[in-house]
Amino acid sequence: MDQVDMLQELNFNYWVELGVGLSVMLSAIIWKLWPKLKPKEDSEENSMDWRIHSDIHEYLTELRVLSDCARAQLIRFHNGEYFMDGVSMRKLSLTHESVSRGVAAEGGKKTNLLISLFSPLIEKILKDEPTINFLSSEREGFHKSFMEISNVHSFMILPVKYKNMVSGYLMVQWCSSTKTKKAINNIVDISKLMVHTRDRIQVLLEEQTRKSQ
């Protein structure tokens, strides 16, 4: 091997060793900094989620207080388990709720329920009309029995949509005839408030969905 070949080989080995060394060094730096960088991303995402959840609860509380209802709720649709033929079970769950003092919350029992059990409510949701519905006028079924257990006297319900598709609903419940009569007397203001609250919640949910994609 002549001197030129030796120099070329030494030069080649030098660059190989330098490249390996830099790769190891860079990997070590990334490994060391990753724990600091990753939580920051998670922290920002978690912060946004908490803000959205907090705002939704604030909107529901405002709706409950101004409409003088017992409960203001946001219920969302989702996929559940699967039937034997592979078809997904469509379900609903209460995700946010504001209740008056002394009123029992429904969050614990309104979770992972088949949407088909609430078909009469779905029909009202699709109408998209902020009207007061008397529970006594509802046809017999699971949805009526469910609300009777919660002492519901009347309710108002509106769809919550994502990309023009119904993804859940907003609901307020009155638990006494006195409160219902008061709501009827203020139906115009309550209807506007209901629509306004629904629209604000939709904006928040759309933001949350965009950030998670």
What are these regions (language model features)?
Residues S167-Q213:
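Juxtadomain coupling helices with adjacent low-complexity linkers
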Residues I52-Y59, I115-S119, I187-T197:
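Well-ordered, non-membrane alpha-helical segments in soluble/globular domains
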Residues Q3-G102, R198-I201, E207-Q213:
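Intrinsically disordered, low-complexity terminal regulatory regions
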Residues A70, N151-H153:
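Short beta-strand or tight-loop elements
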Residues H153-K161:
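A short, aliphatic-rich beta-strand micro-motif
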